[in-house]
Amino acid sequence: MFRQNNIVLIGNSVVEQSKSIAHLNKKVINIDSFNDRDLKGENYKNSDPYGLVNDDVISILQSLELAKEDTLILVSSGYDSSNDFYEQLKKFGMIISNSYKSISDIQNNSNLIAKLKSNNIKIPEIFSLEQSKKEEKVIIKNSSSSGGFGIKIFNKNLNQDTLENYEYCQKFIKGQTYSVLFISNKDKKFEIVGVNKIFNKKTLHTNFCFSGAESNIKLNKKQIQYLESVIEFFISEYELIGLNGIDFIISKDIYFLEINPRITQTCFLYNNSFEHGFVKAHIDVFLNKDLPSIKDTGNTSVAFETLFSNTKFIFNHCLLEYDFISNIPKVNTSINVGDPICTVNITSEDGKKVNKLLSDNISLIKNKLTNIEII
């Protein structure tokens, strides 16, 4: 067990992280943009909707007066670009997340695309604005965000001034989206934790909002070998450590979509794959050289789906009675159109039944939340 007694979790949905380490008898401080009711530990609200490290986060940490040498800080979101918040954060403890340089280099989209191509990693074709107008279906992507945020369907009436400098046009690929979760250490060794089937929905904010996943998806040997080569590229090029995820789509070929150099929302699907949970496994590879052992869970599948609101309302429900619900808002929380309401989970030892069981649980909650239009 590591010696530090304070663990700070920073993000926009850290409920499952806080649950993963609740048994470690450490002081857990959650600085979360949702500040949900089922967080485990001391909870503080971050005004940034994406959970970015900003002035709010720094002020909260200053007020807590935690001993630097006794504090670990996990960032599963990112950093506000208005200041050098990574350096400021280092004053309060050891950061157990990828370096700001690694994250910034990955967000340099033109360089990343060039490196992917030179390493024979397939990506959907990139178009200029004028080229896009001649194509059948194109999407506009945001290089500084993830989880489907900022993705728009291309409109042929757009002009050059419409695109921001962080946006680019990319061919829309038909197929199923997946993610591969891996854990790596300082020696650039890694293990694949699992492959997930990804769900997304159209909300007020984006056409392709990440809404959930199903774990323990089986791919063939050739596909896994290809994904391993992609992971090796990112670890070598960007020195990634800990838990990270890569999104990809399988059509005729495998196409890389994006890299998430952080603990992702899918990590909790594999909490039981690690002896002491996924967050401790992530911490351990930063503090030690050894990769954790990953348990074989057989045919067990875990799945979750986030329910979004298509109605503005005040949340006045108690869902704590349901053990398959997480990310539960506090009573009297204002929910706007496009906002998440809660997350529905299911675990099944028979992977073939997981989707039906998840659907049943979703129906139960929809019946509970009457007079609310739910996506």
For each predicted feature, which ranges?
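A short glycine-rich, hydrophobically flanked beta-strand micro-motif that places a catalytic Asp/Glu
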Residues: 240-252, 294
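Peripheral (often C-terminal) accessory segments that flank ATP-dependent C-N-forming ligase machineries
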Residues: 280-375
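ATP-dependent carboxylate/phosphate-activation module, predominantly the ATP-grasp catalytic core
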Residues: 174-177, 181-233, 237-239, 260-286, ...
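Conserved ATP-binding module of the ATP-grasp superfamily
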Residues: 121-124, 139-140, 149-179, 204-214, ...
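A conserved helix-loop-beta module that forms one wall/lid of the active-site cleft
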Residues: 91-158
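Short acidic-glycine loop/turn motifs at beta-strand connectors
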Residues: 184-190, 250-253, 287, 310, ...
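ATP-binding N-terminal substructure of ATP-dependent carboxylate-amine bond-forming enzymes
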Residues: 1-101, 359-360, 370-373
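A short beta-strand motif that forms the metal-chelation/ATP-contact edge
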Residues: 7, 139-141, 182, 253-263
